[in-house]
């Protein structure tokens, strides 16, 4: 767990003055004369390090337990383990992944309220004790199969203001919570805390206030029954990019006073959260290639002029990744993606109404329904930013189309910052590394050197 190794993943240092976007351009240039223009990702792990620093500035009392389901890349898990994060696992496989790199059981919460018996037994066998539940059936399953479990009661929230709602499936009401606590007492099961999740894409931060208040009620119920509850899990759903209605700090500015009111610092309660997309969404950029194109002329235009008819056309582009691959986020995560062109349009270039489709034989495989684009050609590239969350983790190989290749990069200052965090924790003052996103190459228009990154295999 103490080193990044090329045996684990291809990890490269960015040379000074270059950005992850430059690596995207370099990879495109490398295959420009080849027919093998496969889709690929470039992931900037420096962005993950910056997110970790930002987290503790905004939520200093809350320990992040990364939601592995969001993006289960081993490189991501390893990076976050070095930074000191915990892990929210939802299955035996995720627990195995996290423990395979040396993470201790104490840094894992099995945060799935509905677990298969064999997987409860597996958690018991490998020392994972913290796990969630929200029903009497689950309580009895755990009591029989994991006597040493430290249970966290998942309560329902008002997630009506969230894009991805979860309380329709998970969470106990306050009334049910008391009954579950009483039953746990009868079964001699240890209840150590409360968890909740307000849903992803929450647009009303006051939802957190009500959820924290409800959690306080359950803590008080537990105290009445003799439980020593000392863990509060405020869930996930925090935004991982800036193209959202409610920014991360707008949410945390509401959460912090609620935590101080209901769970003050001297209360003895440890507070954790389950961020997933927060850490990885903005670090991944996906590059796709146009593999086919269709021109649709509006036959109802009423014009006999060929030039007018050509100007009234719409364009359909087919690219080599789709909703059965990385863009499954459109179907399952309510994502709205926008293409970014690798070539800057000319000032007088005409734009056309365009749609973008994936490569499979399914008519459902549409990425963008309508977008104004200049006319592009087969072989041209499009980029999609903020593609790190709920994309590769749920991608399939339907129709035989393979998942995109992943390239991992990080700047040396971010690497050094990660090393410092590992050795000393989050420092009160950390260097401002925001300028590292500015690319000298892009600003100056210079051509990229043959290699703007070097391979890394460095102990930390």
UniProtKB/Swiss-Prot annotation:
Enzyme class (EC, first level): lyase
Record-linked Pfam families: Orn_Arg_deC_N, Orn_DAP_Arg_deC
Database matches in Gene3D superfamilies: Alanine racemase (3.20.20.10), Lyase, Ornithine Decarboxylase, Chain A, domain 1 (2.40.37.10)
Phosphoserine modifications at: 303
Positions marked as site (Stacks against the aromatic ring of pyridoxal phosphate and stabilizes reaction intermediates): 197
Biochemical pathway: Amine and polyamine biosynthesis; putrescine biosynthesis via L-ornithine pathway; putrescine from L-ornithine: step 1/1
Signal peptide positions (record): none
One GO CC annotation: cytoplasm
Domain of life: Eukaryota
Residues found modified as N6-(pyridoxal phosphate)lysine: 69
Matching SUPFAM superfamilies: Alanine racemase C-terminal domain-like, PLP-binding barrel
Activity regulation annotation text: Inhibited by antizymes (AZs) in response to polyamine levels. AZs inhibit the assembly of the functional homodimer by binding to ODC monomers and targeting them for ubiquitin-independent proteolytic destruction by the 26S proteasome.
Positions with a binding annotation for substrate: 332-333, 362
Keywords: Decarboxylase, Lyase, Phosphoprotein, Polyamine biosynthesis, Pyridoxal phosphate
Binding of pyridoxal 5'-phosphate, residues: 200, 237, 274-277, 390
Task of the protein: Catalyzes the first and rate-limiting step of polyamine biosynthesis that converts ornithine into putrescine, which is the precursor for the polyamines, spermidine and spermine. Polyamines are essential for cell proliferation and are implicated in cellular processes, ranging from DNA replication to apoptosis.
Family stated for the protein in its record: Belongs to the Orn/Lys/Arg decarboxylase class-II family.
Assembly and interaction partners: Homodimer. Only the dimer is catalytically active, as the active sites are constructed of residues from both monomers.
Stated name of the protein: Ornithine decarboxylase 1
Gene assigned in the entry: odc1-a
């Amino acid at each position: 767990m103490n080193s990044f190794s090329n045996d684990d993943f291809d990890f490269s240092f960015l040379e000074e003055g270059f950005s992850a976007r430059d690596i995207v351009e370099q990879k495109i240039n490398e295959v420009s004369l080849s027919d093998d223009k496969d889709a690929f990702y470039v992931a900037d792990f420096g962005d993950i390090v910056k997110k970790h620093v930002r987290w503790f500035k905004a939520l200093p009392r809350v320990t992040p337990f990364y939601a592995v389901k969001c993006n289960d890349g081993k490189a991501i898990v390893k990076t976050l383990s070095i930074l000191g994060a915990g892990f929210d696992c939802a299955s035996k496989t995720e627990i195995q992944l996290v423990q395979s790199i040396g993470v201790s059981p104490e840094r894992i919460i099995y945060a799935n309220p509905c677990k298969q018996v064999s997987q409860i037994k597996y958690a018991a066998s490998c020392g994972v004790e913290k796990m969630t539940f929200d029903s009497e059936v689950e309580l009895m399953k755990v009591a029989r199969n994991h006597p040493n479990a430290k249970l966290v009661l998942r309560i329902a929230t008002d997630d009506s203001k969230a894009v991805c709602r979860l309380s329709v499936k998970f969470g106990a009401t306050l009334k049910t919570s008391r009954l579950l606590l009483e039953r746990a007492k009868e079964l001699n099961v240890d209840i150590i805390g409360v968890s909740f999740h307000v849903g992803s894409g929450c647009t009303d931060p006051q939802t957190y206030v009500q959820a924290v208040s409800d959690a306080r009620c359950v803590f008080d119920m537990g105290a009445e029954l003799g439980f020593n509850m000392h863990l509060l899990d405020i869930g996930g759903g925090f935004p991982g990019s800036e193209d959202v209605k409610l920014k991360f700090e707008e949410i945390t500015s509401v959460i912090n006073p609620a935590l101080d009111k209901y769970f003050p610092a001297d209360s003895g309660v440890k507070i954790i959260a389950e961020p997933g997309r927060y850490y990885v969404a903005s670090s991944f950029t996906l590059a796709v290639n146009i593999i086919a194109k269709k021109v649709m002329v509006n036959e109802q235009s009423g014009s006999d002029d060929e030039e007018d008819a050509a100007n009234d056309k719409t364009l359909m582009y087919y690219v080599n990744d789709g909703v059965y691959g990385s863009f499954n986020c459109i179907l399952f995560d309510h994502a709205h993606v926008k293409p970014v062109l690798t070539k800057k349009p000319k000032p007088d270039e005409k734009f056309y109404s365009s749609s973008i489709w994936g490569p499979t034989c399914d008519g459902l495989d549409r990425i963008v329904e309508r977008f104004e684009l200049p006319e592009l050609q087969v072989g041209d590239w499009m980029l999609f930013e903020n593609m790190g969350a709920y994309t590769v983790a749920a991608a399939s190989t339907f129709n035989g189309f393979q998942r995109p290749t992943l390239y991992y990069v990080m700047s040396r200052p971010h690497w050094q910052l990660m090393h410092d965090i590992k050795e000393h924790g989050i420092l009160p003052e950390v260097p401002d590394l925001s300028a590292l996103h500015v690319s000298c190459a892009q600003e100056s228009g210079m051509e990229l050197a043959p290699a703007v990154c070097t391979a890394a295999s460095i102990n930390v």
